Amino acid sequence: MAFVKDMLRMWAHSWKRFISIAMITLLGVAVLTGIYAGCRDAFRSTDRFFDAQGLHDVQVLSTAGLSNGDIAALRKVNGVAKVQAERPQEVTFDLDGRKSATMQEIGTNGIDQPYLQEGRMPKKAGEIAVTRKFIRDSDKRIGSRLTVTPESASSDTSDTNDTNGADGTNETNGTDEAPSFPTKLTIVGVVLDPQNLSNPDGYSAMTSFRSTATTDYTFFAPSDGVTGTLYTSATLLVKGAAAESTFDESYENTVKQVTDRIDGTVKTDRQKARRQELLDAGNKKIADARAEADKKFADAQSQIDANRQQFNQQVDQIVSMQAGAAAAGAAANGANAGAAAAAGATTLQLDETTRETMRETIIAASPELTQAKQQLDQAQSQLNEQKASTEHTLKTKENELKTSIPQVRWYVQDRQSLGGFSALKSDLDSIQSLGNAFPIVFLLVAVMMSLTAMARMVEEDRSLIGTYVGLGYGRLAVASRYLLFALLACLIGGGLGLIAGFLGIPAFLLVVLQGMYVMPGLRLEYDWLYGSLGIALFVVGVLAATIYACVQEMRQTPAALMRPKAPRAGSRILLERIRPVWNRIGFLGKVTARNIFRFKSRLIMTVGGVAGCTALIVCGLAINDTVADLGIKQYRDIYQYDLMVVSDDSDALAMRTKVASDGRVTSSLDVRIESGDLTVAGSGDGDSGKAGSSGSESIQLVAVPEKHLSDLGEMVTLQPVSSGILGTSGVGKTGSLKLDDDGVIVAQSAASALGVKAGSKVRLTNGDGVQATAKVSAVNRNLIGSDVYVSETYYAKLFDSKDAKNTKNSKSSEDSEALTWNAMLAKLSGSDTSQTDYAESLEEDSSVMKAVSCAHMADSFKFDLMGAVVALIVALAGGLALVVLFTLANTNVSERVREMATLKVLGFFDREVHHYVNREMMILTVMGVILGLPLGRLVGGMLTMALNMPSLYFEVEVKPLSYVIAAVATMAFALLVQLFVNPVLDRIDPISSLKSVE
């Protein structure tokens, strides 16, 4: 009992050490669990939402549309739970200039169901539900009416129907109808599209370069009132996928098994069958056209023959009348009846032989008959020409049919192809990667501080330990005094850390996340396993340090332990050998210098602890500086143009004419811009089209006219990149790249994420969904977005081959050779404000789809989630620095109580004692700061390079001010700790302290 009371008394006396260990454990466990828990809560809530709304696991698209046979074949694939055929329609409407929307049918199979936020779901024709983004951008509300106009080419495959005459959806007659929605609409509800969780009312600008939407808005309508049998895609749910977390590898493996089956069995057969359907439909159309033409020609020929017969009868009548009159005259003048009969016979005989001559004479003598004969001959000639021309045309179409219908391509995509899904996943993954790295530093510092604190605690009880061992107490029992002390401190600190880690930090992160994404049903959850492991990790580390400290002392005999420990012997230091410097240092300065290097363990612990905390602060500030400079570097340094304007192909000429003629435009470059995908060649079958796989990146494909290739360098800084461990890729690299016809130039952001370099082979998917293998000629410096530059000639080489032509663009060779330059890069005069205003005014023009001002993008770009995490990390690192300095300062004082007492006996004033002790701590702190600044730069560079976020490349930037802030903050913490330590020095009793050894 006395042993226990003494142990509790010792614990109460060492409350400062207890608080230090508990605080370090609290911070470490909070960092270890907090960022993880915040990301996990977001992952789980989003996964539950996706399962509830039936977000598709797989999407199948085809360059020739999907038929009922395709849908039936997909349903038979092993592992497919549900299949839903999609038939959207693109429409336009007037909202501050022309805006576009996708009319989406609310499926009946429970796939991709919108989440109702206000009002009710549409039930009958003419009712729609809209997204909150549309409500925000317009003055519409529930009950408002809207009129839309279908686009002329709203579907990729509707043109296929016009060109080839069939889509194959109706296999009995080979005819299709493009989707058609009501145009007079009434808003009855506000919904959230599960395919896009971006918060329209949020404060993030990330959507400016991550959005993959081809229209401005999405409207949801019921099946009532929707007509058409043309399917543009099919969405699938996979059996067992809902039971897995959509963000886990197990989910990806489950879905991959189904996509592999589709690729390996259904796709090839249905691609061939679909093309054959189109060929059969085309041949049937030609056969029907020939039959119809033959019928019309036969009718026309019958009409001509009837008219000619009537004409001949009229002429024959005239001939007969003239012949009869001649015979009658001869009979009247004849001598006898025999002579008359002979004359009649002769006349008839002459009529048979000279009938044609007489016909021609009669026709020639009559203008009416002449005109009638000419009309008949002309009609016959025209009919013959039409028959020959039609037959030639049909023969040509028969010969061209096989070449005009390309090979059908299926593209099998998973959820990664959804821009909103991939953006959320990449954001959370990047934050989680930071959360996995920083706790390591906290754990190392916790072990170091625990070793320092517990070693001093054991050393202070050295004589007491010897007494207990001498009295017969086992070494384990004696060591339990300190092990239980450390364990209790860890458990209390860890428990508080779990509260902060599973409640405080996640709540903070989720508030920031909800400013970027809409995540219904978000709730905080506790993970017993991870929480227990988090505490256990720090308990093991701290107890290991405590055991080491106990073993170091208890290996001695009780008699040796009960005697005072001999003071550490002094030694000459390097500075003493530099006589000119050493001789000019005062006495106290020399004592300080010797003390610093005399206690090497304290030197290592202090410098290491301070360096670690400083490095964490620098690392956090480095990430903040890197993100803060992304917009400026991209939109003011890399992009030399001031304005990018994009239009539909049909409005391209009008847009270019309008912009080029404006006086504010000083120079411009016509280009073609398409949204596409970049996939590492060899990561999968080129035909599989898995644009959403881990080896894929959404890109902006920029085609440049052949005659203006040299002008691209004036609009975009094409700078080759280099990379290093510090993440300074592209910095200091000289020279510029030239776009040629031998390959494409890939943006650094995409190249870094995919591991692509110059000479690599990649699979490019253009705006029409056509894939081709391309060579990477160079990688250019690019931080935001993923641009791929290609020359006009190389673009044609990639996508205009027979196998690459999309059915949508199945045109004559003359039409397919030229690209439509649907975008313009322009340099503007005037201030940033005037350039932004000009871009906004252009967006109101009906010929402009999008106008982007680089000045506006540079000023408005921000990455709020990363900024919030950086602020959290810096705050926690600052707290850790404060605890570390407090622990080291108290340990330093407890080690040197007799030394301080001696100074007081010698007549030192309190202020001089403060200065004597604090000077050593400040010097050690400065040494730790000097070591921590470059260490933080190194760690920050390694962490930011490891993020690999889609459409972003972190070119590490640490501003001088950040180094100053980190150094000043650490020094400020050191000064703050001194304010707490100085009263302790004042309370030292010289007499009792000097007699403590006795």
Residue ranges of each PLM-predicted region?
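Short, strongly hydrophobic transmembrane alpha-helices
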Residues: 15-41, 57-59, 487, 601-626, ...
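C-terminal transmembrane helical bundles of large multi-pass transporters
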Residues: 808, 822-824, 841-949, 953-962, ...
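N-terminal Sec/SRP start-transfer signal
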Residues: 1-30, 483, 571-612, 892, ...
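Juxtamembrane segments of multi-pass membrane proteins
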Residues: 587-741, 748, 760
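Interfacial "coupling" helices/loops that link adjacent transmembrane helices in transporter permeases
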Residues: 6, 14, 448-487, 884-925
